[in-house]
Amino acid sequence: MLESLIFSLNSTMPLFFLMLLGYLLHRRQFLTDDFVAMANKFVFHVALPVQLFRDLATMDVRASFDGPYVLFCAAATTASILVIWGLARLFLKDKHIVGEFVQASYRSSAAILGAAFIQNIYGTSGLSGLMILGSVPLYNIFAVVILTLESPSQDARSGMGEKLVKSLKGIVTNPILLGIAAGFVWSLLRLPMPAMANKTLSSLAGMTSPLALLAIGAGFKGRAALGYLRPTAVATVIKLILLPAVFLPVAVQLGFVDQKLVALMVMLGSVTTPAGYVMAKQMGHEGTLTGSVCVTTTFFSALTLTFWVFWARSQGYIL
């Protein structure tokens, strides 16, 4: 139990400290609002697409593919998104935050934490790629659609047909989805990755998380966040507790245990990804609610992930 807690703290608290550093540097005017805007733009258009491309391109999709598992990841992701979206439209009084609330409630840091968690427990991270394949493309497709249809900007309050066309265009031209598609094709074709290219891409990919986290901290508006305490708390509970509580027992009944179950823990119950904040900002949303949920899920996930690992180990689902 203590070992799991220490690992969870080591995995999540550095993310929180980077956000805190960004906030303090902004208060001291080392990081400006212009830096936040440019960092968000760079992560969205360059660093994150490169990271996802490299993660998929260097994975042997053919050798490790497990159709039922990938299908379960996709089904759980789709079901959770649609239910959260429907309930948010029904119960959120402030319709301007529906898009941010939905994305912050479902979108995990699967690509960043998945491999690290599995590797720490089993010494290999091979099955994290299957979870990423079944969830991350859907994360981004739904994010484009939801953030477009629920945009608070005036020009988005047009006819449904125009909104759907805009969503489709957003999916086709989204740099994150283009990176995923390119990486998947590269992996399927089993193309070699030249050492020079791999090192260059690795350097760019390594900038994704630090830049995004610094930007979240630097762009965090404390007073504005106070106005979103209730939706922040609800989104945090959904992200860290409700989604794992619903889908992990189902996964066990279907026979997904050991590495596959650990990957699902990350997919369902890890921190809200900083990429969600970047995408929300780039698509015309305020970003305050998303940033708040990133902070709270990062802070509390060390405890909740430890609980889920303890539960699975005590039941003999992971060894």
Regions found by a protein language model. Give the residues of each.
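Alpha-helical transmembrane segments of multi-pass small-molecule/ion transporters
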Residues: M1-L319
